[in-house]
Amino acid sequence: MRCGPLYQFLWLWPYLSYVEAVPIRKVQDDTKTLIKTIVTRINDISHTQSVSSKQRVTGLDFIPGLHPLLSLSKMDQTLAIYQQILTSLPSRNVVQISNDLENLRDLLHLLAASKSCPLPQVRALESLESLGVVLEASLYSTEVVALSRLQGSLQDMLRQLDLSPGC
């Protein structure tokens, strides 16, 4: 009877069973750091300073505004909308920001899982179906307003993370 693989497995078992979970505080700190990085990237794009995140622009109502109280699921949904908008923009300025939003959403999913509240998958939003028409009419305005509002939303999220948001 050959027990080689069994002995190897038993010998490795203590190492395999000692998997240390990433402390949730580390995930929360990484989330805050990534938010600050994205805000800095937006600040580096000079034309985003010309529009207030609270300003209303006709035809761009589908771009989320500021929310005083954000749950983790609302944060994820908001980031998904921004990510869809940014990936539709042809500007090279927003490619890295869009990638950062994907990473930020992954971190939010980890935070939600740590609270036993997995976030539902966000599907394509109907309000963004008209995005192509809006982009043809006002590409520059869409980019400026989206980045400005994203920056405001990220700053709200940063404040909410300090308050330990719910599901």
From Swiss-Prot:
InterPro entries noted in UniProt: 4_helix_cytokine-like_core, Leptin
Pfam families named among the record's database cross-references: Leptin
The coiled-coil segments of this chain are: none
Task: Please state where this protein is localized.
Answer: Secreted
Between which residues do disulfide bridges form?
Answer: C117-C167
Task: State its role.
Answer: Key player in the regulation of energy balance and body weight control. Once released into the circulation, has central and peripheral effects by binding LEPR, found in many tissues, which results in the activation of several major signaling pathways. In the hypothalamus, acts as an appetite-regulating factor that induces a decrease in food intake and an increase in energy consumption by inducing anorexinogenic factors and suppressing orexigenic neuropeptides, also regulates bone mass and secretion of hypothalamo-pituitary-adrenal hormones.
Which Gene3D superfamilies does its entry note? 1.20.1250.10
Where does it sit, as one GO cellular component term?
extracellular space
The UniProt similarity line reads: Belongs to the leptin family.
* Record GO terms (molecular function): hormone activity; peptide hormone receptor binding
Gene for this chain: LEP
PANTHER family attached to this UniProt entry: LEPTIN (PTHR11724:SF1)
Which UniProt keywords are given for this protein, alphabetically ordered? Answer: Disulfide bond, Obesity, Secreted, Signal
Protein name as it appears in the record: Leptin
**Which SUPFAM superfamilies does the annotation name?**
4-helical cytokines (SSF47266)
Q: What start and end residues bound the annotated signal peptide?
A: 1-21
Any GO BP annotation = positive regulation of interleukin-12 production
